[in-house]
């Protein structure tokens, strides 16, 4: 039967927390697999991704509207995280790739605060845990190893099928699929 209700991320992570062992935790993540969830967990656990925001508390007003009303969902907002991060790209020269170079730090911080205020309070809290790298402290068993196993990612958080397809060439590790496609076009 097709399920029309899409649980919020904190509901999914509570299911992971309550699962008795790692295979069940992995099964919960696989059951709810979606691009937004993958993006969120990537920025939460990949050590090669750094948040381009000040350390510490964020001055925002939590949204007190009931869940499911008057706010955006993290499922959708997770696809905008490129505005707030930079990623270490491995290849012939290791360098940081900024997700969105078109915005300055003040605008980036304002956009982040606006995103938090538009989310429900529990989902905004999840984003802060991801930013502070403390998600695994709130949800037992939700860690880098579990996430990598659930989504078939290698130790560099790259899809193992993509690595196998590319022959495991070191220059491709850490690159985004669109970067690989662009380099293939160039020859």
Which ranges hold each PLM region?
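N-terminal nucleic-acid-engaging modules of covalent nucleotidyltransferase systems
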Residues: 1-187
């Amino acid at each position: 039967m097709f399920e029309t209700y899409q649980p919020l991320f904190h509901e999914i992570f509570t299911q992971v927390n309550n699962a008795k062992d790692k295979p069940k935790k992995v099964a919960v993540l696989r059951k709810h697999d979606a691009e937004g969830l993958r993006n969120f967990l990537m920025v939460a656990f990949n050590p090669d991704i750094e948040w381009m925001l000040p350390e510490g508390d964020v001055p925002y007003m939590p949204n007190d509207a009931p869940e499911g009303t008057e706010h955006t969902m993290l499922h959708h907002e997770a696809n905008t995280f490129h505005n707030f991060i930079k990623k270490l790209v491995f290849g012939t020269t290791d360098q940081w790739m900024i997700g969105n170079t078109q915005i300055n730090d003040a605008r980036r911080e304002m956009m982040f605060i606006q995103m938090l205020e538009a989310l429900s309070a529990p989902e905004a809290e999840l984003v802060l845990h991801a930013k502070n790298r403390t998600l695994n402290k709130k949800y037992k068993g939700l860690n880098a190893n579990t996430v990598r196993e659930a989504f078939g990612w290698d130790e560099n958080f790259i899809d193992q099928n993509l690595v196998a397809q590319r022959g495991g060439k070191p220059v491709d590790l850490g690159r985004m699929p669109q970067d690989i496609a662009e380099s293939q076009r160039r020859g």
